[in-house]
Amino acid sequence: MLKNYVYLNPGLTIDFNGEKFTSQGIVSQFYQKDQGFYVNTEGPDGEYHDYKVIYTFGVTPLQQYIVQFPNGHYQCLRTAWDSVKNRWFDLYPDFKVVHSEWLHWSRGGLNWNNMCADCHSTNVRKNYDEKTHSYKTEYSIINVNCEACHGPGKQHVDDVTRLGNRYTNSGTFQMTFETEPKELVDQCARCHMRREQYSTHFNFEGTMFDHYFPQILNDQLYHPDGQILD
């Protein structure tokens, strides 16, 4: 399950002193209690509840905050902290979302397990149980490290140690100078495009299409140079 995530950093200028932030008619109040960080905001039932903020990811230019829900669900608040301008802001300021919609922060659209972890952690196993609508998400490393792009490193290190200058890639080391452009796109695009994942987890086997369904290029989703339009 989710663990060893970066805790709220007291060295950053973050206001959890009772401030209220309002966007699209929703008021979120951030405060501290019993050495914990909390937010009072609208929940999945349309009522206001107190939620304990237990994890954060990102440092600059922004931080997002995570709340733990039942059954292993981790939800990302829609309100984030601008650590450059020292202010709260809405990730989608012009977009009204009703509490019953999938895009509400407490539902699927901002669910860390399914929407964030695959590209922001290494070797993620979502471990979703459809019958109980629960997660037992696991990962090797909480952030993106070398193995997220280059694959498991143990065999590579063992081979280099054993062979020295005689080392040749046995196929366990991904994304090298020998990687063909099409293969490189397969391995990079999974986190640098708009797509949906339909495999249980990414394991460097097969092609990108064995794991993901990409969105077709159009001017509503991408900039002319190919960057994602956010």
Where would I find each of the regions flagged by the language model?
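Primarily the internal scaffold of c-type cytochrome electron-transfer domains
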Residues: 1-56, 64-69, 90-102, 123-230
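N-terminal accessory interaction module
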Residues: 56-83
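C-terminal substrate/ligand-recognition segments
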Residues: 111-126
